[in-house]
Design a protein with these regions (language model features):
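Non-catalytic alpha-helical scaffolds
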Residues: 1-17, 118, 142, 198-220
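Conserved C-terminal guanine-recognition region of P-loop GTPase G domains, centered on the G4
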Residues: 79-176
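Non-catalytic alpha-helical coupling and interface elements of nucleotide-dependent molecular machines
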Residues: 15, 63, 67, 142-145, ...
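Conserved G1/Walker A P-loop phosphate-binding module
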Residues: 1-90
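Canonical P-loop GTPase G-domain recognition
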Residues: 153-219
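Amphipathic alpha-helical transducer elements in NTP-driven molecular machines
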Residues: 40-43, 103-106, 189
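Short, conserved acidic/polar surface loops in the N-terminal third of protein domains
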Residues: 68-72, 132, 160, 188-190
Length: 220
């Protein structure tokens, strides 16, 4: 029996992280969905199984609230002459008092991403590409885990998909997936899992089984 793939669902507040999880788990009662910022205040998890075998664990995380200040704080954590890599800086953050105070919500996100195989970075594609989102990606990249951007709300006439694609490419994130959690495409789960399999080749067997199970249920 293989170990389940562990994914952290991360991103800014109100981008549709919980709605995406409701779609993937087919559980309308998962989490709390609201237009209020920071609706999710703690990490919530769900497990997807096929024939009694757990294949995927998904963790909904709080929205990142102040990545700009957090990135400045991470830079200040390095002592003179030090060259810490991303995970080392994150470990120092989690050991700090700020991780239990000012950056408590961000620390929850970092802690879960470090404990995961990869992260789904959910983006409200209607939003302009702002500096705070670039800083969020810089913080998340410091965890050293593969990130798959998920462009949400792409069915909206106000989407800025091309702007986001260009911005993500400049950050080295060329693999992404379109997945509107309000009006999910019929093949949305397949495309999401196939994109993940490109980033996590060792998890392909679990992801292929999830795809096959979803298509069997859809055809029933």
């Amino acid at each position: 029996m293989t170990e389940p793939l562990i994914l952290a669902v991360v991103g800014h507040t109100n981008t549709g992280k919980t709605s995406l999880l409701r779609t993937l788990t087919r559980d309308r009662g998962f989490g709390e969905v609201s237009h209020r910022p920071s609706t999710t205040r703690h990490v919530e998890g769900a497990r997807l199984s096929v024939d009694g075998e757990a294949l995927l664990e998904l963790y909904d995380t709080p929205g990142l609230e102040d990545a700009i200040a957090l990135l400045d704080y991470l830079d200040a954590l390095e002592r003179p002459g030090e060259r810490l890599d991303g995970p080392e800086r994150m470990a120092r953050l989690l050991d700090s008092n700020e991780a239990r105070g000012r950056f408590e919500q961000e620390a929850k996100v970092v802690r879960q991403l470090l404990a995961s195989d990869a992260g789904l970075y959910v983006i409200d594609a209607r939003e302009p590409v702002l500096a705070k989102y670039r800083d969020e990606l810089a913080v998340l990249a410091g965890c050293g885990r593969p990130l798959l951007p998920v462009l949400n709300f792409v069915a909206s006439p106000q989407h800025r998909e091309e702007e986001w694609r260009a911005a993500l490419a400049r950050l080295g994130l060329h693999a992404l997936v379109r997945f509107d959690s309000v009006a999910p495409p019929l093949d949305g789960e397949r495309r999401l899992y196939e994109s993940l399999a490109l980033l996590l080749e060792r998890a392909r067997p679990q992801l292929d089984r999830l795809i096959a199970d979803h298509e069997t249920q859809a055809a029933a």
